Amino acid sequence: MRQRMSRMPSSFYIHTFGCQMNQADSEIVTALLRAEGFVPSADETNADIVLLNSCAVRENAEERLGNILMHLKGRKRRCKELVIGVLGCVPQFERERVFSDYPFVDFIVGPDNYRELAGLVAGLREAVARPALLDYDQTETYAGIEPVRAGSISAFLPVMRGCNNHCAFCVVPVTRGRERSVGFERVVAEVVALEKAGFREVTLLGQNVNSWRDAEKGLDFAGLLEGVSLAVPSMRIRFTTSHPKDISEALVKVIAARPNLCNHIHLPVQSGSSRMLDLMKRGHTREEYLDRIAMIRSYIPEVAITTDLIAGFCTETEKDHRETLSLMEAVGYDTAFMFHYSVRPGTWAARNLPDDVPDTVKKARLQEIIELQNAISREIFQREIGKTVEVLAEAESKRSESMLMGRTPENRVVVFSRGRFNPSDTLLVKITGATSATLSGEAV
């Protein structure tokens, strides 16, 4: 039972955790709430409603969610009218735990139920029980809702939701449901609208974006990319995230042929061991993954490839770990998201495999992966010194107002003296320095 509110809350603030899809969802939630008269707050302390758009992919994201919730518990003790809601993936598959561990949370809402959020908040004054909106909607894509975007240069655009792959370690099919795609014409119309609004770059999003389909038009993701590229030839186009088994030669040919499709592919491998990949239910072997890398580079020699890596998955041996390290060297990733394995409730691995790699071993293997990737990244970035590259300026550098930060088509971050340039400008920069994470240079 919850305490009834004496007044209607009017302002809100959103904490966003996790992936780009969650960032896009927070922009959709902002639009839906604003349409019903709620006002975004610039900071949490002045908001009547604090929403936490949660991520369940890894344990550390849930830990950060818990830390902020405990901070809000103290604030709610001082201000009982504060409304706290948890959105997204965590409540979708751990409803009872959210309510039991955090009894001060007023409501929870899953990723398919954001259209009902404003009505839920409006009804809180009369609610006795804590509302939970967690129904799956296999048709919901939020198409037609114009997000309130956080930036004005680069935009995220979800083109599909959900995932049908059921990898052993992954909660996404549980939290996001089955795959469904936004239609071709709707995607193109939204990208054209972004261009007219002044955006210079768009990233097409999906948990498994290469599975996008428009059955009525007989189009796959290669057809979508080509259509979007032709519709907005002056915009940079990116996409994420891809599954290795779905990277087709036709798709790579489109990227190679269209100048505004960025030469960057994020292709999560998770492990370099075929035994591990089989246990993870990834649907490909080490050799098949390397064949796809070779195919990509045969069409796009200058492509930047990035990845995700998991250290210490169930039953992983030292031999399996060494195969991951050797694959990293063979591919030469620009960068990687690197984590040690944490059990996710509701996954196939949680039900069927022992989490038998000691934490000390997981952390040691992860550190080896990080150190190797840093060395590979440093070598790749140092090879850029002396080259002149195209950069889309995105913002002032955190180091100095006299510097700008931008990215190359390969998604490499470049910091340079701003001179006469401003954010949203596209310019040429001669690279003069490099670390394992950043390039630096001078505008040409």
Curated annotation (Swiss-Prot):
Assigned EC number: 2.8.4.3
Binding site for [4Fe-4S] cluster 1: C19, C55, C89
Cofactor remark: Binds 2 [4Fe-4S] clusters. One cluster is coordinated with 3 cysteines and an exchangeable S-adenosyl-L-methionine.
Cofactor(s) for this UniProt protein: [4Fe-4S] cluster
Gene Ontology CC terms: cytosol
Domain TRAM: start-end pairs: 382-444
Family listed: Belongs to the methylthiotransferase family. MiaB subfamily.
Family matches, as InterPro entries: Elp3/MiaA/NifB-like_rSAM, Methylthiotransferase, Methylthiotransferase_CS, Methylthiotransferase_N, Methylthiotransferase_N_sf, MiaB_methiolase, rSAM, rSAM_horseshoe
Subunit structure: Monomer.
This protein's name: tRNA-2-methylthio-N(6)-dimethylallyladenosine synthase
PROSITE patterns reported in the protein's UniProt record: MTTASE_N, MTTASE_RADICAL, RADICAL_SAM, TRAM
Domain Radical SAM core: 149-379
Record carries keyword 4Fe-4S: yes
Positions of the MTTase N-terminal domain: 10-126
Matches recorded under NCBIfam families: miaB-methiolase, MiaB/RimO family radical SAM methylthiotransferase
MF (Gene Ontology): 4 iron, 4 sulfur cluster binding; metal ion binding; N6-isopentenyladenosine methylthiotransferase activity
Keywords of this entry: 4Fe-4S, Cytoplasm, Iron, Iron-sulfur, Metal-binding, S-adenosyl-L-methionine, Transferase, tRNA processing
First-level EC class: transferase
Organism: Chlorobaculum tepidum (strain ATCC 49652 / DSM 12025 / NBRC 103806 / TLS) (Chlorobium tepidum)
